[in-house]
UniProtKB/Swiss-Prot annotation:
Reactions catalysed according to its record: a 4-hydroxy-3-(all-trans-polyprenyl)benzoate + H(+) = a 2-(all-trans-polyprenyl)phenol + CO2
Cofactors, names only: prenylated FMN; Mn(2+)
Record note on quaternary structure: Homohexamer.
Lineage start: Bacteria, Pseudomonadati, Pseudomonadota, Gammaproteobacteria, Enterobacterales
Membrane topology: Peripheral membrane protein
Keyword Metal-binding (UniProt): yes
Classification via PANTHER family: 3-OCTAPRENYL-4-HYDROXYBENZOATE CARBOXY-LYASE-RELATED, FERULIC ACID DECARBOXYLASE 1
EC nos: 4.1.1.98
Name this protein carries in UniProt: 3-octaprenyl-4-hydroxybenzoate carboxy-lyase
CC terms in the record's Gene Ontology section: cytosol; plasma membrane
Binding site for prenylated FMN: 175-177, 189-191, 194-195
Cofactor notes: Binds 1 prenylated FMN per subunit.
Protein family membership: Belongs to the UbiD family.
A GO term for molecular function: metal ion binding
């Protein structure tokens, strides 16, 4: 499934009935969110609003509104194929040399994919077809959405932020929301542990008082966008990973005003800087929790240049109580996480982040239990192995006879295999998403682990219950005579 840029991808979606063009004038203030939310909840297509009220630039929304479109963006036919992406990432995280000719032959596809990792640098690029700078910069010309009635201001939601630390060769790509506060100013809301914020902190330490260069790409190709939200190894750039997904090298171009490299095919690029002395209160905004978040101070991003393609498209989304687009992304990326975790913990059978748990706040893990205390080791591993699970508040561990994705199974295991005092692990004073207002202190809270596995000697002194199993001969006999019983006149089986 090949595409070169966002426009190629939209053509592919339209051919498959996965894109709907909206010609009726619709207001970016609240109305686009309402339409996109209804469409996403119905499993509908990506939406291209061609006539947003008050603007000449179209708005793309709900691009990754189904797991299928996330998989397509990663170059795969369906969600199940994302397990292979996870296996590739697990290999890149801890590459192993071939153990012999046969192993080398088996790993050739992985080595071949690695050839697409280096970026291709262009002298000129579509994203620089039109350039404005200085006083001509006006972010109000972009149809930035206001998503919820009590939001503080219009909000950029799909901005691919490009940064580089003072002592690093590779750039960092991250998705951080940005509040519009002036014709050339945005608030950069990045949490302190995220890559862009870490680059900024290192810059301030190395160059006190100096401006920190930042660029933001809007409407990059899907592989690059998804690369920025995928748990790539720290040694691998998001551009390199995008090349692996796409099957071709990622094309980049140097910015007009700084040395950062941005996706050459991006629809819009914002170039500028962060002044360490300029902060502003951000929010409140309706967030993925389904609540408005607290107001907090973050750095101000001053835009000095806007470059864009001819007839540029503005890519946007909204966040709210699941399901929303981030929740759908979480469902799809869940398949990527599983092989990465299994590489470190082979006993893990499945790993599931229920979307109704805000995509990351609760995890269900099933394991092949091998010893007493095994479930607790897995809990600690989930919390510590990947940064993505730093904010996971609840981890439920079950045996492999439980379907991690079936709440009927999980609740049955919790209520029959757990003693609340013995099998609950509480860890206090751990990092928590600052958006989690349920924690007693902003950014610091507790975690709970639930051991819903069968208990081994040493974990209990009682004889453990034996699960009921049907007699297979009786089952086979009843299967054979079921239709004759005619219990359900419509032929329904039981």
């Amino acid at each position: 499934m090949k595409y070169n840029d966002l426009r190629d991808f939209l053509t592919l979606l339209e051919q498959q009935g996965e894109l709907k063009r909206i010609t009726l004038p619709v207001d970016p203030h609240l109305e686009i969110t309402e339409i996109a939310d209804r469409t996403l909840r119905a499993g509908g297509p990506a939406l291209l609003f061609e006539n947003p009220k008050g603007y000449s630039m179209p708005v793309l929304c709900n691009l990754f509104g189904t797991p299928k479109r996330v998989a397509m963006g990663m170059g795969q036919e369906d969600v199940s194929a994302l397990r292979e992406v996870g296996k590739l990432l697990a290999f890149l995280k801890e590459p192993e040399p071939p153990k012999g000719f046969r192993d080398l032959f088996d790993k050739l596809p992985q080595f071949k994919q690695v050839l697409n990792m280096p970026t291709k640098r262009l002298r000129g690029a579509p994203c620089q077809q039109k350039i404005v700078s200085g006083d001509d910069v006006d972010l109000n010309r972009i149809p930035i959405m206001t998503c919820w009635p009590e939001d503080a201001a219009p909000l950029i939601t799909w901005g691919l932020t490009v940064t580089r630390g003072p002592h690093k060769e590779r750039q960092n790509l991250g998705i951080y929301r940005q509040q519009l506060i002036g014709k050339n100013k945005l608030i950069m809301r990045w949490l302190s542990h995220r890559g862009g914020a870490l680059d900024y902190q290192e810059w301030c330490a190395a160059h006190p008082g100096e401006r920190f260069p930042v660029s933001v790409a809007l409407g990059a190709d899907p592989a690059t966008i998804l690369g920025a939200v995928t748990p790539v190894p720290d040694t691998l750039s998001e551009y390199a990973f995008a090349g692996l997904l796409r099957g071709t090298k990622t094309e980049v171009v140097k910015c007009i005003s700084n040395d950062l490299e941005v996706p050459a095919s991006a629809e819009i690029v914002l170039e500028g800087y962060i002044d360490p002395d300029e902060m502003a209160p951000e929010g409140p905004y309706g967030d993925h929790t389904g609540y408005y978040n607290e107001v907090d101070s973050f750095p101000v991003f001053t835009v000095t240049h806007i470059t864009q393609r001819e007839d540029a498209i503005y890519h946007s989304t909204y966040t709210g109580r699941p399901p929303d687009e981030p929740a759908v992304l979480g469902v799809a990326l869940n398949e990527v996480f599983v092989p990465i975790l299994q590489k470190q913990f082979p006993e893990i059978v499945d790993f599931y982040l229920p979307p109704e748990g805000c995509s990351y706040r609760l995890a269900v893990v099933t394991i092949k239990k091998q010893y007493a205390g095994h479930a607790k080791r897995v809990m600690m591993g989930v919390w510590s192995f990947l940064r993505q699970f730093m904010y996971t508040k609840f981890v439920i561990v079950c045996d492999d006879d439980v379907n991690a994705r079936d709440w009927n199974d999980v609740i049955w295991a919790i209520t029959t295999r757990m003693d609340p005092a013995r099998d609950t692990v509480l860890v206090e004073n751990t990092p928590i998403d600052y958006l989690d207002f349920a924690s007693p202190v902003s950014g610091l809270g507790s975690k709970m682990g639930l051991d819903a596995t069968n208990k081994w000697p040493g974990e209990t002194q009682r004889e453990w219950g034996r699960p009921i199993k049907k007699d297979p001969d009786v089952v086979a006999h009843i299967d054979a005579i079921w239709d004759e019983l005619a219990i359900f006149n419509n032929g329904k089986s039981a």
